[in-house]
Amino acid sequence: MDSEPSWTATPSPGGTLFVPNTTTPWLGRDEELAKVEIGILATVLVLATGGNLAVLLILGLQGHKRSRMHLFVLHLALTDLGVALFQVLPQLLWDITYRFQGSDLLCRAVKYLQVLSMFASTYMLLAMTLDRYLAVCHPLRSLQQPSQSTYPLIAAPWLLAAILSLPQVFIFSLREVIQGSGVLDCWADFYFSWGPRAYITWTTMAIFVLPVVVLTACYGLICHEIYKNLKVKTQAGREERRGWPKSSSSAAAAATRGLPSRVSSISTISRAKIRTVKMTFVIVLAYIACWAPFFSVQMWSVWDENAPNEDSTNVAFTISMLLGNLSSCCNPWIYMGFNSHLLPRSLSHRACCRGSKPRVHRQLSNSSLASRRTTLLTHTCGPSTLRLSLNLSLHAKPKPAGSLKDLEQVDGEATMETSIS
């Protein structure tokens, strides 16, 4: 007697995972809805590719001046570009041809790369958030080992994505949609009927639910730390307005009284650091908004026997499967929105140091150290003028050059403020 046939599932309209195939696969599809899918995927492909290439170009022109935050954004752009090229593009071609056109090896490779890009993009965002958590809540640890703590956080998402995507290679294969029909497609194959439900639930937990829980916890702690920081600075300001005869160092010491040891030496959070926290927070919100419909529909498709399937004409169901890819479109534009000053600076980088004489400005600004403000001399070159910005301190001892370098690495953009006048 032959063994029980394996349970099969077909790719979803999103193409990354699958939904159960409960209809006769030879009936074709809704061509009008397919045109809408193709239009959406083509738009996502253009926006995601163009936006992430622009970010890579901007950061590439920064050269060795990239901060640790820029390194995370660089790799996030690479993962999002991977989503565009290895997930959206194959699915676009697949929707155009309807059936998968390629060998069994190509089928497995496409499915592997599609999920790898999802894992890498999600975990890179998670690593970037963890870096902001360490920079805000544990600044001393970041100061002691600035580079050692950065590269493992960047390498871990790529390694985890490569490992966790391996099941796709064994689940998907090129096979006949109906035995003896001669029509081939890249389908998932499970021996047990509960296989799709278990696999979809696992991927939803690994790519969406657990990362969102960690992201929420990190930002809860970050917001709590910023709130304590603002409370301390407000109290210090009130004491100064009362006319207490205190020097800057003693005022800072009073301000840090009662704070935990990890922030007692660095009692204020710089504006640049807060800006990077805001940027990462907006990227996280965009990620949740884009991927929540996708994974909700995936879970619905395997846990509800009456859910629509891949050949359904339910427009809302089909479009929801495509929304997750919008996250890779939003990320580069969010980054450029928070760092709009980098675009003209990068484009004018090669025309630097020409024209008139530099003009020097003395500028007093709040540093990331309340009691250890450091003098920074930075410059940026524009088409016509060169501006030098000085952050001066009148009540602090000079810091060693090595310490200053560490501070700049931890703070993302540190306390440098450059502009083109």
UniProtKB/Swiss-Prot annotation:
Looking at the record, which segments are called Disordered? 399-421
Q: Which Gene3D superfamilies match?
A: Rhodopsin 7-helix transmembrane proteins
User: Which segments cross the bilayer?
Assistant: 36-59, 72-93, 109-130, 152-173, 203-223, 281-300, 319-338
User: Which cysteines share a disulfide bond?
Assistant: 107-186
Ranges facing Extracellular side = 1-35, 94-108, 174-202, 301-318
The record's section on SUPFAM superfamilies has: Family A G protein-coupled receptor-like
* Localization per record: Cell membrane
Q: Which domain of life is it from?
A: Eukaryota
Under InterPro entries, the record lists: GPCR_Rhodpsn, GPCR_Rhodpsn_7TM, V1R_C, Vasoprsn_rcpt, Vprs_rcpt_V1B
Q: Which CDD domains match?
A: 7tmA_V1bR (cd15386)
Example GO BP: positive regulation of arachidonate secretion
What residues are glycosylation sites in this protein?
21
Task: Supply one GO molecular-function term.
Answer: vasopressin receptor activity
Record bears the keyword Transmembrane: yes
Question: What membrane topology is annotated for this entry?
Answer: Multi-pass membrane protein
Q: Which GO terms describe its cellular component?
A: Golgi apparatus; plasma membrane
**UniProt-listed Pfam families:** 7tm_1 (PF00001), V1R_C (PF08983)
| Principal subcellular localisation of the protein | membrane
Q: What does this protein do?
A: Receptor for arginine vasopressin. The activity of this receptor is mediated by G proteins which activate a phosphatidyl-inositol-calcium second messenger system.
PANTHER family named among the record's database cross-references: NEUROPEPTIDE RECEPTOR-RELATED G-PROTEIN COUPLED RECEPTOR (PTHR24241), VASOPRESSIN V1B RECEPTOR (PTHR24241:SF18)
Recorded protein name is Vasopressin V1b receptor
Recorded source organism is Mus musculus (Mouse)
Q: Which gene encodes it?
A: Avpr1b
